[in-house]
Each structure stands twice: as structure tokens, then as C-alpha cells.
Amino acid sequence: DIGKVEELSVFPENDYTDEGQLLGHIMIGAEMVGERIRTIEGFPVRMANELKHCILAHHGELEYGSPKKPALAEALALSFADNVDAKMETIREIFTNVPENNVEWQGFNRLLDSNIRRSSLK
């Protein structure tokens, strides 16, 4: 998600920049890594392509915005981590204003495709 630093304007606005609207954070991130790699003398081309692939495939599926599906184990692991991170952030947001002792159902969430509530575990 390194490309988000260029995709979005500074806080508190967090609006999309022109570059963000046109290219998106995935492409911007791959370009940023490519530019940095070019400054490292002797950096292996194969590894550079593998790193850029991981960035391009980190959303995991074409319908989620990735221009490529993961074709490397590392890219697949990164896409899983990105997916779990997004889902856990959604849960955190759901429970932000819910008291810790509230174990009532919070309603259906489209991203999680589930009705959600806190567990009773302490």
C-alpha cells in the first residue's frame, strides 16, 4: 500500500490526487519500488520483477483491483495478509463505539458478508 502516500492528499483531507485518480495506489506503488530498485547497482532483474509482481497482485483478485493475480507464493501470502488486515480493520471500526461488554449482534456487514458481534471471551 506504499502507493497510497501519493494516491491520497495529506491529512485531514485524504482526497484522491490526480495521480491517484488516474493510476491508483497499486500502480503507483509498483512504480515507486521500481524507481528505488533502479538506484541499487546490480539489483537482480528477476527479483525486481518478483517484488513488483507482489505489489501488483496484493489485492489477490482482479475484481478487487489487482492488475495481476498472485503467481508467486510470496504474492499469495501478501494478498492474504492484506485481506485479513482489511477485515480486521472493518471489525475494529464496527466496535469502535460499542461498549466491550456488549455482545449484541451489530448487523450485517457487506465486506465481511456476515452479521457480526463480539465474542463473550475475556
Residue spans of the language-model regions?
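Divalent metal-dependent catalytic cores for phosphoryl transfer on phosphate-bearing substrates
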Residues: 1-98
